[in-house]
Amino acid sequence: MRVLPATLLVGAATAAVPPFQQQFQQVLGIPQEEVEQAAPVAPSAPTTPKPLQIFQDQLKSLSDEARKLWDEVSNFFPDSMDHNPVFSLPKKHTRRPDSHWDHIVRGSDVQGVWVTGADGEKQREVDGKLEAYDLRVKKTDPSALGIDPGVKQYTGYLDDNENDKHLFYWFFESRNDPENDPVVLWLNGGPGCSSLTGLFMELGPSSINEKIKPVYNEYSWNSNASVIFLDQPVNVGYSYSGSAVSDTVAAGKDVYALLTLFFKQFPEYAKQDFHIAGESYAGHYIPVFASEILSHKKRNINLQSVLIGNGLTDGYTQYEYYRPMGCGEGGYPAVLDKGTCQSMDNALPRCQSMIKSCYESESSWVCIPASIYCNNALIGPYQRTGQNVYDVRGKCEDESNLCYKGMGYVSEYLNKAEVRQAVGAEVDGYDSCNFDINRNFLFHGDWMKPYHRLVPGLLEQIPVLIYAGDADYICNWLGNKAWTEALEWPGQKEYASAEMEDLVIEQNANTGKKIGQVKSHGNFTFMRIYGGGHMVPMDQPESGLEFFNRWLGGEWF
């Protein structure tokens, strides 16, 4: 089915635009062959679900305004509306027997624990619906992989047996003082990209070189913290499912269950401070996940703060800063010509109008067109230049691997049979990013929903750090600084007026070196990191570890 075409608005992107599938493929850097393989549709299968086929009945009841939005984006992307299946396909997998695992923590057992409260009444030890969940745990031999020998490691799966979901995690104990150092959960974005890319390309104990061998990382974030890397949502990385998660809120329930069962199995870590950190689409995830945790008053998760790096959190504010960043106003030379910059300026009012409608209704019918239109008008022009969307300083060196050859090295390493065996992976293959997941989230309207509205509630209880490498385009520092200043909360005026101060290294051979700028008031802090792209710990490992350690030490809160 196709919706009726509508006249394009003046001010839309003037250059020819790629079809919807190709456009978002470029955002994630996923090769065409992977997209085609991920959605094999036989010509003789006319009943394969398609976005507008699935929505056909509901479209009849749309308001005139919503229908016009769909008409508009259909005119931009007619082919994509006909040919893209909505739902992700299950990954091939072989579940390992229970005897493979050292521990299996049953959610039903945890939920069944009752204690006597201060008032003498019986109450559950921890909140939450956990009976459908299990946690499988295996102590991993570091020597088998050559990754951080001497550091305790655990891998395993969180199982949602009711919904056939299985999330893979990899835990590294702190190199320093694991009995006292904090615990951090790390999340990559996408949506649909594996957190193991963060492990091996950014902040984990090893990177993978061109010989597909692990190389020790002296700037690993487990230098002074224990770190959990989680492949979520399902069907990302080593995780798998027969069903799908298509929005951030649903994914939050899984993360709460994982942490609750993990800390039940390892109470020695539960007593430590706990923090959530992540980047990119984790700007959506983290406000939701932290709010989910804090909503449970009886919990064994000692959440102390959250850190979001180069995140997408408030689209209305952040999309305004694509044109300035691409046109030379972000501290680096312009990538786009004057005509393109003007076209983006012309498109912005319509984009923001659509995002505003999404914020007001939070309806998928309104939020999906906003995502498609705004990404086409404000990200598409930059993509067509061939420049790296994650770093304005250079060209995209490897389109099949998010512009980075290192991403391919990581995928090749994690697809080795001996690696999958060592960590207990149950899938037949590893993918750095799953395009189907990205599309699922978009077609559920998740991309533009106002998750930033949860941040004031977080600020009432815990500190929040927003940091941004200043060479990134896709989630650039201008937009991240702007949304933090626009956020409505009791400390808004004081925070917005706070001056940016130099951020300098304090304790090593480079003491006094300026690595960025920082501003802070109350529980809210923003950092600009010089010379960092979308992945700060990869581009500026020393700077990343410096601010990370100082943040966990409580310097700004």
Swiss-Prot record:
**Reactions accelerated catalytically:** Release of a C-terminal amino acid with broad specificity
Q: Which keywords accompany this UniProt record? A: Carboxypeptidase, Disulfide bond, Glycoprotein, Hydrolase, Protease, Signal, Vacuole, Zymogen
Q: Which Gene3D superfamilies match?
A: 1.10.287.410, alpha/beta hydrolase (3.40.50.1820)
Q: List the disulfide bonds.
A: 193-433, 327-341, 351-374, 358-367, 396-403
Active-site residues, as the UniProt record annotates them = 280, 472, 534
PANTHER family on file: SERINE CARBOXYPEPTIDASE CTSA-4.1, SERINE PROTEASE FAMILY S10 SERINE CARBOXYPEPTIDASE
Q: What is this protein called?
A: Carboxypeptidase Y homolog A
Gene from which this protein is expressed: cpyA
